[in-house]
């Protein structure tokens, strides 16, 4: 244990935490262009065809981003907005595409959690 005088002289070393979304570079979102839209299969206990897109960000980095919701209109050269947030059963997918922004349409006929999928509230 250091003495008070040693702490005055040197101080304590700050622990550096590793970021979970390095491509965002401390931004809440980043814009990117879709390079390829495809499906991948999840890890062991789960079985599905999850929709993902390979995206080139404005910072020239290439990432894999998950496309949430049912159905999408993302094609090559679509402009996308990316946020952080991993998909637990897809290794290497640490980003998600924000629906209802730029060239990406919202999920059609979505009633619950509609704000997360870029859909307007249905008036009864």
From Swiss-Prot:
Location in the cell: Plastid
Keywords recorded for this protein, A-Z: Plastid, Ribonucleoprotein, Ribosomal protein, RNA-binding, rRNA-binding
GO terms for biological process, alphabetical: translation
Protein's UniProt keywords contain RNA-binding: yes
PROSITE patterns: RIBOSOMAL_S12
Gene Ontology CC: plastid; small ribosomal subunit
Example GO molecular function: structural constituent of ribosome
Function: With S4 and S5 plays an important role in translational accuracy. Located at the interface of the 30S and 50S subunits.
Subunit and partners: Part of the 30S ribosomal subunit.
HAMAP family xrefs: Ribosomal_uS12_B
Entry similarity comment: Belongs to the universal ribosomal protein uS12 family.
Entry protein name: Small ribosomal subunit protein uS12c
Source organism (scientific name): Helicosporidium sp. subsp. Simulium jonesii (Green alga)
